[in-house]
Amino acid sequence: TAVNKQPWHFIVVTDKDQLQKLAEANPNAGMAAKAPLAIVVCGDMNKALEGDAREFWVQDCSAATENILLAATGMGLGSVWTGTYPSKERCDAVTKVLNLPKFLIPLNTIVIGYPDSQVTPKDKWKQENVSYNAYEGD
C-alpha cells in the first residue's frame, strides 16, 4: 500500500440476518442473502494518507479486494465484488447495517460462497483497450 499505511478494515459477515440486510442495502449484492459469507472492505480514514494522497485508500483497498477474490478462487470458492463507494446512498445503507463509525468508508462488499456450477471463463481481451508507448486511439 502507499507508504505501507494499510488503510483498510475488513468486516467479515456470516450472520444470516446481516447478510440479508447487506443484500437489501446494495442492489448489486442480492446474492449475499443466500451466501455463507461476505466481506465488507472499508477504507479507514484514520490510516489514510494526508492531502492530495488521501484518496489512495481507494487503490489500496481495491488491491486488497482483488487479492481476496484471487484467494477465494484458489480455494475453489465463488466470489463477486459488488461496489458500494462512491454511491452515497449505498455507503449510507451499508454504514447503517454495520454500524460503521464515521472514519470507515465502505468501498465494496465481496460475496463469497460455493458455486452452483462450474462456469467456463470468458475471453474478455480487447486489443483496442491497449496502447503502446502513447495513446493510439481516435
Where are these regions (language model features)?
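Acidic, surface-exposed loops and disordered segments
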Residues: 1-138
